[in-house]
Amino acid sequence: MLFMVIERYKDKEAVYKRFREKGRLMPEGVSYVSSYVSTDGNVCYQINECESEDLLHMWAANWEDITDFEFIPVISSREMSKNGKRK
């Protein structure tokens, strides 16, 4: 299942420092797909794939001190237009 993850940074310098030092810190079972960052660098819009939102909460626990998270299950617009609904 795909998830749009919206990360709102409380302290972007701390986020980028931790990322450089430790990487994404994602648990096994979560696959990073792609991400885009707002031009001010304070918000990241990320697509991840995993079987359960619970895995995303495990990942977020490594960052919650400096980032607020929102998880939204998503499907491609192509899939939606073909099927009219989520499988």
Q: Which residue ranges define each predicted feature?
A:
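Short S/T/G/P-rich N-terminal loop/turn motif that feeds into the first structured element of a domain
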Residues: 1-33, 37-43, 51-58, 75-87
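Conserved catalytic core of Hanks-type protein kinase domains
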Residues: 49-50, 62
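A common structural junction motif
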Residues: 63-70
